[in-house]
Amino acid sequence: TMQYISYQELFPDSDDSTKLSADIKEVFSLFFQNFDYKILGISVDSDEKNASAQLKLTTLDAEALASDFVSASLQEEILETASGKENDNGNSLEQRYLLLYKLLKNNTYSSAERTTSIQLNNLGSSSEPDWEITHSSSLENDLVGGLITYLSDPDLVPPAETLTVYLKTLQEMDVKQMANYLGLDSILNTSDSAKNAIASALMEQFHSCFNYKISSTSVSGYLAEVDAELTTFDSNSILTQYEKELNTYLASADAVIDGSQKRYNKSHELLLDSIRNCLL
């Protein structure tokens, strides 16, 4: 298989051409473990210099594998951003094959059949033939069940499924990851302890409340529009409760006695309580 399929061919846009480790090469063993073929017919030119063989190939469902790979790649990219760490090897050949390995190791894929034509050249003579398979990109693609074509298809994963991967990954993050991904980490790192507590409480509420439901999709050429209902905390309820509690406090004798600094601190305390007591 290695003679006819280049490691780089599966991912021509990868950032490097590093040779793969022995462990990663097991990807091909896993991919071809149920590979099978049937020769349907062979035709030889009259001069016996060229021949064409028609075959039926049985491979795993490369379209399903490619779809899983694209979705998993997007998820990894999102989580990498959420980690707050830069990964210079994110687009490397090694990383991509590691992901393929994980998918093939953990998932079960059904079989798929496709017919193909293989060209052969006779490097010998008619009396002492020496037939050699002609290498081509189409042969590489057919041997892997069309995986190369599927991986290069920008429309392989529909818009609604792409958005689902994004939102589901966001939903499954912990609070710190979510804050990093949404760019709120700087707000949480303020030196003002009261503001930090309020920002943290808001993130906790968002983390616990966030949900989504995709309702419809429309595609026009290269553009797609996906309608989705997003559920988050009720900011109006928080502000209404806060204003009510604050007005009650400001109208009390305690507010006069406390002075400006204590009133300032009390306002933060009331806002924090309103956030923590927020109900959907």
Question: Language-model features: where?
Answer:
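Core segments of small alpha/beta cavity-forming domains
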Residues: T1-N34, K38, L143-K213, S237
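Long amphipathic N-terminal alpha/beta scaffold segment
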Residues: K38-D47
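Beta-strand-rich interaction surfaces with strong enrichment in secreted/lumenal proteins
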Residues: L40-G41, L104-N107, S215
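A short hydrophobic beta-strand element
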Residues: D47-T59, Y222-T232
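Short, cysteine-centered beta-strand-loop-beta hairpins and adjacent loop/turn segments enriched
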Residues: T58-E76, T231-L250
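Short beta-strand edge/turn micro-motifs at domain boundaries
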Residues: A64, S73-L98, K102-S152, T248-L280
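Charged, low-complexity helical/coil segments in non-catalytic cytosolic or luminal regions
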Residues: M173-D174, G221, D234, L246
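Extracytoplasmic/luminal low-complexity segments enriched in Pro/Gly and acidic/polar residues
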Residues: C209-S216, S220, T231-F233
